[in-house]
Swiss-Prot record:
Coiled coil (residue ranges): none
Domain of life: Bacteria
Name of protein: ATP synthase subunit delta 1
Keywords, sorted A to Z: ATP synthesis, Cell inner membrane, Cell membrane, CF(1), Hydrogen ion transport, Ion transport, Membrane, Transport
Tagged with keyword Amino-acid biosynthesis: no
InterPro entries, per the entry: ATP_synth_OSCP/delta_N_sf, ATPase_OSCP/d_CS, ATPase_OSCP/dsu
Organism: Vibrio atlanticus (strain LGP32) (Vibrio splendidus (strain Mel32))
GO annotations of cellular component type: plasma membrane; proton-transporting ATP synthase complex
Protein family membership: Belongs to the ATPase delta chain family.
Lineage of origin: Bacteria, Pseudomonadati, Pseudomonadota, Gammaproteobacteria, Vibrionales
Job of this protein: F(1)F(0) ATP synthase produces ATP from ADP in the presence of a proton or sodium gradient. F-type ATPases consist of two structural domains, F(1) containing the extramembraneous catalytic core and F(0) containing the membrane proton channel, linked together by a central stalk and a peripheral stalk. During catalysis, ATP synthesis in the catalytic domain of F(1) is coupled via a rotary mechanism of the central stalk subunits to proton translocation. This protein is part of the stalk that links CF(0) to CF(1). It either transmits conformational changes from CF(0) to CF(1) or is implicated in proton conduction.
Gene Ontology molecular functions: proton-transporting ATP synthase activity, rotational mechanism
Subcellular location per the Swiss-Prot or TrEMBL entry: Cell inner membrane
Membrane topology: Peripheral membrane protein
Amino acid sequence: MSDLTTIARPYAKAAFDFAVDKGELDQWGQMLTFAAEVAQNDDVHNLLSGSMTAEKLAEVFIVICGEQFDEFGQNLIKVMAENGRLMAFPDVCKEFFILKKEYEKEIDVEVTSAVELSEEQRAEISSKLEQRLARKVQLNCSIDETLLSGVIIRAGDLVIDNSARSRLDRLSDALQS
């Protein structure tokens, strides 16, 4: 875990709690995404690394962000600038969306298959995982031809390996025992 992630977590939590209270999760997600993109811009990155005062940094950052931020979002920028944390915006954004997904009972699921899955297969996998995990599932599918056949599903700490490669490995281990 990076230092910026540790630094970002309390800011993300504060922004998340505020957004939940105001019923503005999507708006705050958009503001933080924009701020993360701004903070990652090379010119802005160099500016943030400079010797400007916190007040001036906040002012410049707010001008760059323009109408994207409401007064509460601008307050977050000011607080982060005062604490020298504007560089942490990408991590704040990442942590905010982790909290948002947890709050909305959503989970990203990585599905790796030997061949491209049909829409029916994706729908079936999604449906079964939603039942098992009691969450809305967002599938991210990829292809790995070395699997031969089958799928590997990763959802958080859960890994379901139903690939031909893993079955062959288990058979090989059983035969060698």
